[in-house]
């Protein structure tokens, strides 16, 4: 099993990829199980916890980035530059495992365009397209 932290700079509590099932030049399939211990559930919403839509989009983008790094290598960081066509179709609750299916639409040395869908079981929960710029992290 691949150590996700070797593929992404994100760390707890903002690492949203548990495992990668498939990663090739066209597609990534990865998973994230959201537990009741997620810090954002304390405020979104305490009486009826739901994974925020922005976290689902971040999860898709992290899955896409980790999968691309796994299949193609490289050392540059991915910086979200645009999010388009985001739609949320089903609530994701504590205990749900999300299956992310991400397609590489365009990959170059300096940018990445992907589209992804997040499923709980066979039910579509969210979908979006995004653009990432690829570059080195600024030094402090």
Language model segments and positions:
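Flexible, low-complexity linker/boundary loops enriched in proline and small hydrophobic residues
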Residues: 1-21, 132
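Short Pro/Gly-enriched beta-strand edge/turn motifs at strand-loop
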Residues: 1-4, 96-100
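Beta-strand-rich interaction surfaces with strong enrichment in secreted/lumenal proteins
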Residues: 5, 47, 88-90
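Catalytic strand-loop segment that frames the active site of acyl-thioester-processing enzymes
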Residues: 12-51
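Hydrophobic core residues within well-ordered beta-strands of beta-rich domains
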Residues: 14-16, 98, 112
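HotDog/MaoC-like acyl-thioester-processing domains
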Residues: 25-27, 92-96, 103-140
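Compact, glycine-rich, soluble single-domain proteins
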Residues: 41-68, 80
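Hydrophobic beta-strand-centered segment that forms part of the acyl-chain substrate-binding groove
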Residues: 63-99, 125, 132-133
């Amino acid at each position: 099993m691949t150590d996700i932290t070797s593929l992404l700079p994100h760390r707890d509590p903002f690492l949203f990829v548990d495992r990668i099932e498939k990663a090739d030049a066209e597609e990534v399939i990865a998973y994230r199980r959201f537990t009741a211990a997620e810090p954002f559930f304390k405020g979104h919403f305490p009486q009826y916890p739901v994974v925020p839509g922005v976290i689902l989009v971040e999860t898709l983008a992290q899955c896409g980035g980790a999968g691309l790094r796994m299949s193609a290598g490289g050392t540059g960081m991915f910086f979200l530059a645009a999010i388009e066509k985001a739609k949320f179709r089903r609530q994701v609750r504590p205990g749900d495992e999300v299956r992310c299916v991400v397609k590489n639409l365009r990959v170059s040395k300096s940018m990445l365009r992907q589209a992804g869908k997040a499923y709980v079981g066979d039910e579509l929960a969210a979908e979006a397209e995004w653009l990432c710029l690829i570059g080195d992290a600024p030094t402090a």
